[in-house]
A protein has these predicted regions:
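N-terminal subdomain of nucleotide-sugar transferases
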Residues: 1-74, 207, 227, 430-437
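Carbohydrate-associated surface elements
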Residues: 214, 230-233
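Conserved donor-binding/catalytic core segment of Leloir-type glycosyltransferases
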Residues: 244-271, 424
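A conserved catalytic-core segment of Leloir-type glycosyltransferases
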Residues: 42-121, 125
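Nucleotide-activated donor-binding/catalytic signature segment of Leloir-type glycosyltransferases, i.e.
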Residues: 284, 289-291, 296-322
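Acidic donor-binding loop of glycosyltransferase active sites
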Residues: 206, 311, 325-344
Length: 437
C-alpha cells in the first residue's frame, strides 16, 4: 500500500530558479518507491523567478495543496520605490558596491530583526492551523520540510510537537551560515533567536538531510547529531526533447546566478591573455553568460577587454537548459575562493545538470572541495583554485586544442548515473522508510 508524505515547501511551480528543482523532481520519482507526495505550498507567492514550463513536470500522482500567504514584498517595493514587476533579491540584500539609502538600510534591519527566520514567518500559524485539520482527515506517514525559507521547518516542528508525526528537515542551504547572514544588521537578540530556532529544528527533527558533505558536518556540529546527505541531481527526462546544435565557435557557457563573491577575476585575466597570445583562439571564442550576473562581474569582463566575446542573456526556461548545455564546448562552474568558509562544501544544482550533458566542465573553486571530488570521481572536468591563473590558461588551451582536433571529451561514465533524480529519490525513500519504522 502506498505510504503518504507531506512535503512543506515554499517553492513550487510556477516558481523558477534552483529552489524549486529538488522537490519538484523528488516528488516526481518518490511514487516509484512506494511514497505518494502531498505538497503543501503557497497560492500567491511572489517568486523572484517564474517559469511556467515547470508546470508540466508536476506528476499526476502528486497531490498539491495551495494556501494563501502574506508577502511583505509589496510594502517593501512601495517603500523603496521599486517597480511592481521588479523582483526582490534573496534576503533583501542589494549589491554591495551600490550606495545604499537610509530606506534600504532600514528595510535590511527590519528583514534581519523582525522577519525571523525570514519573511514567510507569518505563514507559520495559519499553516499549522490548516494542516492540523487536514491531517486529522487525511493522515500521512511522514512529513518533510525544506528550507530556505526556514519558516517551513517551523511549520513542521509545530506539527511534530502537536501530532507526533515523523519529520525529516531538509536543508537545501544553511541558516545562520548562509552567505548574507552577517549583512542583515542583526541585533544580539535577533542573532540569538536565529541560532536558537536553528538548533531547535536540528535537534527536534527525526532526521536532518542536506545536499553536500561539508554542509552536513556544519549542521551536525550545530545540532550535535549525524546529518544525512542526499545530493541534488539531474533528470534524464529533461534530455528527451533536447535539440543539440553544434557550436560554430569555441563556446564557454555559464548558466545561473553569479554573485560578486563568485567572480573569477583570474579566469578573466587568463582568457584575456590567451586571446592576445592566440589570434585564432580570439576569432573562435564565444562566452555565454546566462542568468542573473552581478554588475561587478560585468565590469571586470569589460576591464579585461572581453566584452566583444560575451553574450548576456536573462533567465531561460528550464526546458531549454539541457539544449544550452549540450550546445556548448565548455561549461563553467564558478564556486567561491578557498578563503570563504562554505567554499569547500558548495555543490550547486547546476553541477549535476552539467554532468548530465557530458560536456567538459571547468570548475573554479577549492581543489579539495566536494565539487572537485565529484568531478574527479566522474571524470567530468577539471577544478582550479581561484588564484591559479596559469593552471586556468593551461586547462583552456588544452581543451581548445582538443576542440581543433575534433577530439573533445564527451563524458559517458556510469559513475554519473548515481546522481540521477530517480536514484536520489530512492535514497530519500529509504530514509522515509526508516523514519516511519
Amino acid at each position: 500500500m502506498m505510504k503518504r508524505v507531506l512535503i512543506i515547501t515554499y517553492y513550487w511551480p510556477p516558481s523558477g530558479g534552483s529552489g524549486v528543482q529538488r522537490w519538484l523532481k523528488m516528488s516526481k520519482y518518490l511514487p516509484e518507491y512506494g511514497w505518494q507526495p502531498v505538497i503543501y505550498t503557497t497560492e500567491n507567492a511572489e517568486y523572484p523567478i517564474v517559469d511556467p514550463s515547470l508546470e508540466k513536470d508536476v506528476s499526476s500522482k502528486v497531490e498539491v495543496i495551495r494556501r494563501p500567504i502574506f508577502e511583505p514584498y509589496t510594502f517593501y517595493k512601495k517603500f523603496l520605490g521599486i517597480k511592481k514587476e521588479e523582483t526582490v533579491k534573496m534576503g533583501f540584500i542589494e549589491e554591495k558596491e551600490k550606495k545604499k539609502s537610509w530606506k534600504t538600510d532600514l528595510s535590511l534591519w527590519i528583514r534581519g530583526n523582525l522577519f525571523i527566520p525570514d519573511a514567510r514567518r507569518w505563514w507559520v500559524k495559519p499553516s499549522v492551523k490548516y494542516l492540523k485539520s487536514y491531517l486529522k482527515a487525511h493522515p500521512v506517514d511522514a512529513i518533510v520540510s525544506t528550507g530556505p525559507p526556514h519558516s517551513m521547518h517551523l511549520i513542521a516542528m509545530k506539527l511534530k510537537e502537536e501530532l507526533g508525526l515523523h519529520w525529516i528537515a531538509d536543508f537545501r542551504d544553511p541558516w545562520t551560515e548562509i552567505d548574507y547572514y552577517h549583512d542583515l544588521h542583526l541585533t544580539r537578540w535577533a542573532d540569538r533567536k536565529h541560532h536558537r530556532l536553528e538548533k531547535e529544528v536540528l535537534t527536534k527533527a527525526d532526521k536532518v538531510v542536506t545536499v553536500a558533505p561539508d554542509g552536513a558536518k556544519r549542521l551536525g556540529r550545530i545540532g550535535n547529531r549525524n546529518v544525512r546527505v542526499v545530493y541534488n541531481g539531474f533528470d534524464r527526462d529533461d534530455d528527451a526533447t533536447t535539440t543539440v546544435v553544434k557550436p560554430e565557435k569555441f563556446t564557454i557557457t555559464y548558466l545561473g546566478v553569479l554573485s560578486k563573491i563568485q567572480n573569477p577575476e583570474k579566469l578573466w585575466e587568463a582568457l584575456e591573455e590567451v586571446t592576445k597570445e592566440n589570434y585564432d583562439f580570439a576569432n573562435k571564442l564565444q562566452i555565454n553568460m546566462i542568468g542573473q550576473i552581478d554588475s561587478s562581474v560585468v565590469k571586470v569582463i569589460e576591464k579585461r577587454g572581453l566584452s566583444l566575446y560575451v553574450s548576456y542573456s536573462a533567465y531561460i526556461p528550464h526546458d531549454q537548459v539541457s539544449a544550452v548545455h549540450r550546445s556548448s564546448t565548455l561549461l563553467l562552474l564558478l564556486l567561491m575562493p578557498d578563503s570563504e568558509p562554505r567554499a569547500k562544501g558548495l555543490l550547486t544544482g547546476k553541477l549535476f545538470e552539467y554532468l548530465a550533458s557530458g560536456r567538459p566542465i571547468l570548475c573554479i573553486g577549492p581543489e579539495d572541495g566536494d565539487a572537485a571530488r565529484i568531478l574527479n570521481e566522474t571524470g567530468a572536468g577539471t577544478t582550479v583554485s581561484f588564484g591559479n591563473k596559469e593552471k586556468m590558461k593551461e586547462a583552456i588551451k588544452t581543451l581548445y586544442n582538443k576542440y581543433l582536433e575534433g577530439n573533445l571529451p564527451n563524458n559517458t561514465s556510469p559513475a554519473v548515473e548515481k546522481y540521477s533524480r530517480r536514484n536520489l529519490a530512492g535514497e530519500f525513500a529509504e530514509m522515509l522508510n526508516k523514519v516511519k519504522s
